[in-house]
C-alpha cells in the first residue's frame, strides 16, 4: 500500500488546497485526510511531502503504530521528529550552530536522548524533577517555536508534520496525547509560527480528533477520500496502458470498473495483472476471464487475509455476521443474528474499532475499513 500509481486521478483539488496552505504559511489551517483502505491516502501524503519539500518547507514524516500512540511514547515520538528536523536546515556554519542550539532546546523537553547533528553529538539527561510539572502541550509548543526559529535562519517557509495511520492515537483517561498535539499546534499558530499539521488515517480518526478537542473542526480542512468516479476511474485504468500503446476492450473496462467499484488500489491491481498477463496489444474479454481468478486470489492473500487474521475468534464471527449484510450492518441486525445484547457485543466491537477492522459510519452502524472486505469474507465461506 502507498506505492505511487502511474495515474493519480481525482485528487487534483486536494493537492491544490495543500498548495494554498504552503503559499500562506500563517493561514493557521491544517489537513485531516481520511478514507478506507486502498483509496490512495498514503499516495496523496507522498505528493504533499514532495510539494512541501520542493517549496523549501521542513517536513517530518511518520507512520504511527500502536506503540507510538502509547502515552509513555507519544511525547518522545513527536519531539524526536522535531529534533530530526533541525538536521535538515540548510545554510552555513552560523545556521548549523543555531540548529545545534535548537536541537539542544528541544532535547531538554525529552529528558534523555542523543542524536548526531552535523557531526556533533547532541544529548541531554534528565536534570531535576521540576520538568515533570510541565504539560506536554507546553513542551510541544515550545519545541515547535524553537524549530520554527531555525526556519528563518535557513530560509525555510515553515514546518510540516505529516502523520499517517494516525487513527491509532486517541485520548486515554488520565493521559494527554492527541489533545496535547492539537493544543500545541493551535497555540503555535496563534503566535504566527508557520506550522502545518497533516493527520491521515481511517474514518474513525475524525471521531478521535473531535473527542480530543471541541474546537478541532476549526483547525482542519477535512479531505474525505473515496472511490474514483467517472471519468477518473476509467482513466486510472486506461491512461497508463495507452502511454505504452496498450488498450483495453470496452467490455473489459466496464467489467473491471464494476469489479473494483472505482477503488484506486483495486484498479491498480487489475490493471497490473491484465497488463502482465495479456500478450496482445489489445487486452480482451478472454484475458480478463482467464486472469480474474488469479487477481481475486492475489487480493485475498495480499490485501484482505492479513486484516482478517488480526481478528480473534469472536471478532471474526462478528466480521462474518457483518458480511452477511454486505459491507456494513446495523447493531440491531448484529444483535438479532448473534443472539447477543448490545452490551454483550460492545467489548468485541471496541476491540475491532481499535484494531482498525471496522468503523462507525453512523451511531448504530458498523462498516468494514477495507472496501469489498465483505465480498472477501463471503468468498472464504464458499
What do the PLM-derived regions correspond to, one by one?
Residues 152-155, 159-162, 167-213:
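Sensor-1/coupling segment of RecA-like P-loop NTPase cores
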Amino acid at each position: 500500500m502507498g506505492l505511487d500509481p502511474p495515474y493519480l486521478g481525482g485528487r487534483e483539488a486536494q493537492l491544490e488546497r495543500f498548495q494554498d496552505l504552503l503559499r500562506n504559511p500563517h493561514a493557521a489551517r491544517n489537513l485531516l485526510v481520511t478514507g478506507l483502505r486502498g483509496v490512495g491516502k498514503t499516495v496523496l501524503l507522498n505528493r504533499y511531502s514532495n510539494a512541501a519539500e520542493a517549496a523549501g518547507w521542513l517536513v517530518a514524516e511518520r507512520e504511527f503504530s500502536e506503540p507510538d500512540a502509547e502515552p509513555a511514547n507519544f511525547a518522545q515520538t513527536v519531539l524526536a521528529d522535531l529534533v530530526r528536523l533541525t538536521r535538515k536546515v540548510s545554510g552555513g556554519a552560523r545556521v548549523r550552530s543555531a540548529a545545534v542550539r535548537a536541537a539542544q532546546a528541544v532535547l531538554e523537553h525529552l529528558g534523555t536522548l542523543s542524536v548526531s547533528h552535523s557531526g556533533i553529538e547532541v544529548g541531554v539527561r534528565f536534570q531535576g524533577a521540576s520538568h515533570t510539572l510541565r504539560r506536554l502541550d507546553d513542551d510541544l509548543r515550545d519545541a515547535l517555536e524553537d524549530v520554527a526559529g531555525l526556519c528563518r535562519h535557513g530560509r525555510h517557509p515553515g514546518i510540516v508534520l505529516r502523520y499517517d495511520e494516525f487513527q491509532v492515537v486517541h485520548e486515554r483517561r488520565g493521559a494527554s496525547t492527541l489533545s496535547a498535539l492539537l493544543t500545541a499546534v493551535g497555540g503555535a499558530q496563534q503566535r504566527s509560527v508557520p506550522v502545518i499539521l497533516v493527520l491521515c488515517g481511517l474514518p474513525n480518526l475524525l471521531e478521535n480528533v473531535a473527542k480530543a478537542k471541541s474546537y478541532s473542526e476549526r483547525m482542519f480542512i477535512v479531505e474525505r477520500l473515496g472511490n474514483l468516479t467517472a471519468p477518473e476511474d476509467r482513466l486510472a485504468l486506461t491512461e497508463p496502458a495507452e502511454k505504452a500503446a496498450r488498450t483495453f476492450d470496452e467490455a473489459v473496462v466496464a467489467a473491471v470498473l464494476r469489479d473494483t467499484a472505482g477503488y484506486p488500489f483495486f484498479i491498480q491491481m487489475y490493471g497490473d495483472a491484465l497488463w502482465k498477463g495479456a500478450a496482445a496489444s489489445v487486452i480482451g474479454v478472454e484475458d480478463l476471464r482467464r486472469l480474474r481468478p488469479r487477481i481475486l486470489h492475489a487480493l485475498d492473500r495480499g490485501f484482505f487475509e492479513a486484516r482478517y487474521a488480526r481478528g480473534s475468534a469472536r471478532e471474526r464471527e462478528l466480521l462474518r455476521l457483518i458480511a452477511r449484510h454486505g459491507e456494513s450492518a446495523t447493531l440491531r441486525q448484529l444483535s438479532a443474528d448473534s443472539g447477543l445484547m448490545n452490551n454483550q457485543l460492545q467489548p468485541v466491537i471496541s476491540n475491532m474499532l481499535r484494531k482498525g477492522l471496522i468503523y462507525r459510519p453512523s451511531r448504530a452502524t458498523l462498516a468494514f475499513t477495507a472496501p469489498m472486505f465483505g465480498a472477501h469474507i463471503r468468498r472464504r465461506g464458499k
